[in-house]
Amino acid sequence: LDLAGVLGLDTDIDRRALQHYTVLQYVPEPETLHRGVRRLESGCYAMIRPDCPPEVTRYFRPRFSAVGFAAGTEQARYDEITAVLEDSVAKHMRADVTVGAFLSGGIDSTAIAALAIRHNPNLITFTTGFEREGFSEVDVAVASAEAIGARHITKVVSQSEFVAALPEIVWYLDEPVADPALVPLFFIAREARKHVKVVLSGEGADELFGGYTIYREPLSLRGFNYLPRSVRATLGRASQPLPEGMRGKSLLHRGSLTLEERYYGNARSFSDEQLRAVLPDFNPAWTHTDVTAAIYAQSRGWDPVARMQHLDLFTWLRGDILVKADKMTMANSLELRVPFLDPEVFAVASRLPFDQKITRTTTKYALRRALEPIVPPHVLNRAKLGFPVPIRHWLRAGELMDWAYGTIERSAAGGLINLPAVRIMLDEHRLGGADHSRRLWTVLIFLLWYAIFVERSVVPKISEPHYPVRL
């Protein structure tokens, strides 16, 4: 912001970008929250000449081009996945410093760690959890580390630590990202940096191999494809008066929509009515299609799961997953490497057909088959959890709830956010009348960002390095 001011750029808040953030939980590229500032998009370069506007050119255009499995070739295709992933991990292990690995209770990070230990028998793995029961992958991660023979280190985060770290975390983010998982990631990166300088992690596997449960939605909605558009529209209208949470309401509503209308990533938590209540400048013309229409235009004719994956590469992955991974690790001077996002791995994953990614009972089908010889059985078919965060419970009692009320009361962002409406939402959540945790978190992170970078009423205390420093 200081540089923007020196350059004379317009740093007023961009209301449209704020609305996009509230819907998506991140600010989509190339937008920023400042009207006069834009970002160079991932996969692009800019040519700047005197007295000319910047010329932006995209050099990377990922495509999903499914190639069906010929009879008798299934195992060969699974072996191809294994081989290319083994090669990627080997390349990412090359370093003049010690390399470790993040290890949750899921298949992706476990696969990376299991392959990495072949190159470093002294591999250290790291995981994090919370004091609250039910919000920890620690036991599964410990069992996985033991199964592959890795030394394992765990960091358990208390509610007090969680709250105290928030200003520093948002300061390092530079922009609001409303993913609660970035907090445990910050702590495990800090712990890992005491022992290693580089870590491998499992980001990207879900987007490449079809790992999100929502990717199964085209199967559950397949019957709607046989109905005339007018009938689907009638069913959609019929769903509107049904009470929220009523069985079948969401199915009827989503089945009445096209893929482009209903799917814009993993993050939606606000309805339009809730957005109107929270955003004084809510504009119904500012929709997710501002972000997604051009991306969907590139994938016409692909199967629906491939189109969803492609959209997530350009939105969720680059706007949330990789931002939080990169910034939380670099905040602790730790280099993060992501073997699943190697171009050769993508080349293999992008050729998988629909039925090798999603079935009615599982996700990442081909990847699971390919990893059967590598990943311990207790992890192979385990449901996806990631780093679960207990914000729903902590926003109902304790230090995080107190911090939330204080953040709302002290905020000077009333021209951008309807603070009394947010206070009512927090009251409803606290009393158990509704689960507003993700909506509250989205707004609270923005308010904290605003307090740090615009109001300057919050000055984060930046921690000293948590690793030996040679003077």
Language model features with spans:
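Cysteine-centered catalytic environments shared across enzyme families
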Residues: L1-L173, L185, A189, E372-P373, ...
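Adenosyl-5′-phosphate
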Residues: V6-D10, R15, T32-S42, D51-P53, ...
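Active-site catalytic pocket residues across diverse enzymes, especially alpha/beta-hydrolases
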Residues: A116-N120, R216, P353
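Extreme N-terminus nucleophile/cap motif
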Residues: R15, T22, P228, P241, ...
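Short, solvent-exposed loop/turn segments at secondary-structure junctions
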Residues: D2-L3, I107-D108, E131-E133, S160, ...
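Short low-complexity, flexible loop/linker segments enriched in glycine and/or proline
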Residues: P167-W171, R193, Y215-E217, W394-R396
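Acceptor-substrate binding/catalytic loop of class I
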Residues: E175-D179
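Active-site adenylate/phosphate-handling loop in enzymes that bind or generate adenylated species
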Residues: F187-G245, W316, I321-V345
